[in-house]
């Protein structure tokens, strides 16, 4: 007999936890739609040459490739399949939703209205090293705005407002959206003589590791043999990326001070102007000052980000790390089309976020079941009555389960309690003869009679009151 088990790096939930997870998905979806984003889905696997066009960083080394059983069984066929794509299998599982989005927009460009506002909530796959809190299969919940030829920086501010709306409704504690612009980093590097190209991108990736690995690690890496940057330059880089702001006025003051201290640089000036406009619009969008700040160390590891970048953290739980991140990209879709399709977006890694919140004891106030009432069957002869009662409750919008086999009342109460069902409806001979049913509230341990015709309205009131209970 084979032992039942899941592969490492998978989060599989019991129904009560799945309900909590699903409700978080619902909150995210609801807020995405409130801001006018439209849903799409893309295939779980893409053509390898399309998917790996410009991922960069660690991600490309974590891709799962897909081969047919026929290709695996026939070595020659497998070799032929791989030879068409530089030795790689033809298909690969998506590692994020941004690259498939770029392919989607380029492929359907003539059928879409621009700016195209999309949300997408699907699983993605990465070959992470199996360890606690790291997942190989996980949900990402993304929004992106794609423009045609150009995309106003104003959308960067709106995306931040969406982040705020989502996490404010999720109610998981105070949070802060940390803002930066990669043009600031690039312009500053240019002033130090760190040239454009691969070196600059590599330095950006290392800077992005400061919060996880620490400044000493980044310093040692940048002065080491792989980079060979002078210690004095590295010290200036670390001082630059240590800049933080508190409050709206301080953020603007930090940008003004940077502009005065570094001097003329087209790239740096562009980044400062973009960040300044984002900050002003975020204020106009009603995002409270406590919810955002500048953090010049935020770079984002993926190479396709070119301007604004975001990372969101929980104020009281910094150990959880980033709970939402993203940024602007100018040229990702240019690998699939001659049209210029710039975009800006963010992603919530919901699987890891849920796991971290559960570990921290922050998943609270969630009903244990999506079933709101159960109608007990105590006598086979009353099945038609029980089914009619359940039908009426469902018409009223109450999620209702029916016990299809007669059992002792005590056993049905035990079942409902274990399943997390709060209200049990009893329709025995005595109750039905009086034109009533009995309702057992398993949380308050109270039982009351209600007229059969008034059951649905009474339960709706009880359910509304139950929502308000701590």
Swiss-Prot record:
Keyword Acyltransferase: no
E.C. number(s) listed in UniProt: 6.1.1.21
Major localization class: cytoplasm
PROSITE patterns membership: AA_TRNA_LIGASE_II (PS50862)
UniProt KW keywords: Aminoacyl-tRNA synthetase, ATP-binding, Cytoplasm, Ligase, Nucleotide-binding, Protein biosynthesis
Intracellular or extracellular location(s): Cytoplasm
Matching PANTHER family: HISTIDINE--TRNA LIGASE (PTHR11476:SF7), HISTIDYL-TRNA SYNTHETASE (PTHR11476)
Protein name in UniProt: Histidine--tRNA ligase
